[in-house]
From Swiss-Prot:
Its EC number is 1.17.99.9. Pathway: Porphyrin-containing compound metabolism; heme A biosynthesis; heme A from heme O: step 1/1. The keyword Coiled coil does not apply. Belongs to the COX15/CtaA family. Type 2 subfamily. Its cofactor is heme b. GO terms for cellular component: plasma membrane. It catalyses: Fe(II)-heme o + 2 A + H2O = Fe(II)-heme a + 2 AH2. It comes from the Bacteria. This is Heme A synthase. One of its GO terms (biological process) is heme A biosynthetic process. InterPro entries: COX15/CtaA_fam, HemeA_Synthase_type2. Catalyzes the conversion of heme O to heme A by two successive hydroxylations of the methyl group at C8. The first hydroxylation forms heme I, the second hydroxylation results in an unstable dihydroxymethyl group, which spontaneously dehydrates, resulting in the formyl group of heme A. It comes from Anaplasma phagocytophilum (strain HZ).
Amino acid sequence: MRTSHIATWLGTCCIMVLLMVFVGGVTRLTNSGLSITEWRPVTGVLPPISDADWAKEHEKYAKTPEYLYINSGISLSDFKRIYMTEYVHRLLGRILGIIFFVPMLYFAVKRQIKGALAARLGIVALLGALQGAMGWFMVKSGLVDVPYVSHFRLAAHLFLTILLFSLLWHSFLESRGVVAVHKVTHGKYIFAIFMLVITVLQMVLGALVAGLDAGLIFNTFPLMDGDIIPSQILSGELLTGKFLYNAVVVQFLHRFFATVVLVGAVAIPLLMRFKESWMLCFGIVLQFLFGVATLVHGVPLYLASLHQIWSFVVVALEVYILKVIRKV
């Protein structure tokens, strides 16, 4: 029963993280992330209530680069819409913190969390605190001189989320009694790890694509406006020290590693030949198709959101496979 309670708690935390990822993606895609100009973890729990409160928040926003260069003259009703989108994202973060920390303290006092699980959840707690700070660090980059957040900070924000989700998911699987049932060679085990690493790298590149709005260029597939490799890259752009600032290069890299992951997805069931490997193959192929559809349709909200959230499903499948295999 105790294990069941812990599993339910950890499963709820995983779902909450995915919900935060979804809302965070919507926040990014609707350009709502810079609407709240302060970080008030405690006093910012409630949104503006009165007309005077809303006018005050609108006045603060009117001093930001985004307002001055992009949204000058935005109506109060439109401002409320983007403000509430960002507010919901931050509120979910607070709720997730409560859902995680309160039960963890209870289970710790009852001595139901021990050993490796306790250490792992301690890391999750630290990552959660760091993630909140990173979120504000990211937003702050778009409130000073330029009307957009640093794409590197956006990528770091996502990377921390991936780590946090992976640790929670691994802990959930463990609490559910998931154990290694498939024997694989050392090489196949390393390949499974490689697939997880390359997927995470691809997700981070996806964040860079989002941060640079690189999905809004070269909306053709498989060629990039008629070329396999764009002329900007052939001219040596990839070799410069600032290639990750170039939207063309970043989109090309995202395409390239998507192909690498896809090839790996096809190889996994051929190498391992058990049910879970086919599930992963299907999940990655679906993610690849979501990515292509998002690109060629000009990054619509519903497809881009699906593409982002499904990447976490792929990570969950890869962590699951690493949990059910063992080296022989």
